[in-house]
């Protein structure tokens, strides 16, 4: 892996972290879920439990896939910037702060284009009718991301599982 990084074999690398927290006070998973929903109203929040993996709570600004019958939607979310100072007033749905206050680097824009191109390529395997909008700046907590929206038709809903496997994980 290290040699591949040194030889620039990767176009993009995404690092993530897992946090395991211990509580000395009893707290129910339902209470944690409700608190996460309250703290992150614009995010997809999920509480999952399986015998094999235990209980997981996640909050993500990403929507893998949504829709019904033939009309579907997904997003490309890439580029991340922490909001600071006056930027914390940013709300993409209002004009309380100018969008020019959020300045995206060339690296972030390139990363967004990379992910959007990948999603377009995936969708075109299953649909002849793919429409892309964006990228736009969206907020998730104290962060902002670049997001492109994709609307498309899925003529064969029997291919839904294959499409999900193709889309996930995105680069």
Residue spans for each PLM region:
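Hydrophobic, Leu/Ile/Phe/Ala-enriched alpha-helical segments that form helix-helix packing faces
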Residues: 1-5, 36-40, 123
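Contiguous alpha-helical scaffold segments within structured protein domains
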Residues: 3, 21-22, 75-171
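Short coil/turn segments at secondary-structure boundaries
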Residues: 11-17, 47-50, 134, 161-162
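A residue-level signal for beta-strand positions that form part of recognition/binding surfaces
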Residues: 12, 71, 143
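An anion-binding catalytic pocket shared by soluble metabolic enzymes
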Residues: 17, 22-114
